[in-house]
């Protein structure tokens, strides 16, 4: 067993290998405080025949026992991955994927298992570090290691690896990962911070995780397995020359077409023609031809951009595609918008709900509720393809979370706008940057629904082409530019600052200056888009949709909650059935009444106020005789509140039989004489006009 330790943000970070999971190629136990994550890496020694992509799988899983819990449900065991697990799996995948050598297509699986967790820090950083360490000691070809850190911004200062408590007061939650030389991945949400603060946060995190990289390198030197004797496939030079001569002019013609579907069809025709001419019946040779065509395409697109020629669709490097915006496009929804940017289009719908519609999240750290949900759907027809339709894939979950982060910073507080909010983005067309179209559409749909956002939010995706010292930063990238470029850099925010930033870099050598230029170019693009959005809708509509619930909030004495609920829920059930309103009661006495019909909500409010009203001594009430006894009658003066009208208090004259003066159901006016310590009420009809 080999163990290494390093001080990381004021906490001891420990890496251990050789004690657990010894049959995996690489296994590292990462711990900090009471949080422990076991990360394993296993690779296949042989590539599958015909494999033409790198099959890397990353699975992050949280075990309930890690927090001393037993899973819910009938089977009492962990089920499908939670959203948190899916997002963390993507977080690990993104910075390690570019570090495997080109041409390496053997299957690799990384599994990170949270086996113990405290309530102080998120295990995701430990899982990222563990994945890097497990690969570093495994012998699998990997050009790492990487380090990772979380950065907060509190009271004007950067904080490394903040606790959950610190994050509640932070203006920034940023995760950065990279190698010694370069930043490879950034994921963040922010409270409208400037581009300068965001860039400094990235550089701060990169500097702070360098000791972690050194520790992983020390662990690998001492405990690492011999590196695999893997050699990149040898290129067929003669075939390369033949394919290049034949295909280059055809591919140049294809990339001269600015319309995506026409271009895709032409590229497909070229690929089929080259496969027929050079592929023969050898599957390996066919793979080589496809790989050569991909290289030629990459060279054509990148070369044109670096030479200053127009991009694939005819734009220069800083121009945003044409944008059309419509708000209120669906008649019965609470809010909707159709946002179209070039060949990317999103139909975004906002729905207002009550507290009962909030999402309940059962995490290792405890149960919580989320009043804001954003769901992103990417159907196959959006790219002119067929495919499976069903539960969301990892990509859809990741894009939805990015858009949610972008919008969350401008939402009103629960006290300002007591609604739960669900936004759904249906991507109808896609040619790059559909997640940023979702951000723009979500902002518009929420404002169309009457949500008082602090400011409109827009997003833009940036790209980078870099060859040696030459580089070009691209605004509003297309899908092809994303695939063939060196960086995918999404920035969302308001006129005041950044609310979300996501960056994936595929190469080394991205300098601070390049990132600064990309951020400033993104700001210009964002402001342009916001100007167009503001021309359609610049703030929340003054009124809610006719079909949205109206919410009334009142405060009652917590001791009176039982009066509103009634025995077995009888009273509140009757209230909801008779008024049609939805009623939610918190333990602190906050009552939320929701109803599409405003009058129904007002009626429910009046009845709750009567149910919880205190009976006042010497006050006259209009009551109803509930039950007659030999010694008097019980009179209901408020809902659920009966008082005793003694036979001696019915009249100034002597009463021998109560039935001579009162009948059940009779309306009477009574005065409260006394409310004793047990809450019993004494009433009188004497000297009160009936």
Curated annotation (Swiss-Prot):
Pfam families: KH_1, PNPase, RNase_PH, RNase_PH_C, S1. GO terms for biological process: mRNA catabolic process; RNA processing. Residues 549-608 form the KH domain. The keyword Metal-binding applies. It catalyses: RNA(n+1) + phosphate = RNA(n) + a ribonucleoside 5'-diphosphate. It is found in: Cytoplasm. Component of the RNA degradosome, which is a multiprotein complex involved in RNA processing and mRNA degradation. This is Polyribonucleotide nucleotidyltransferase.
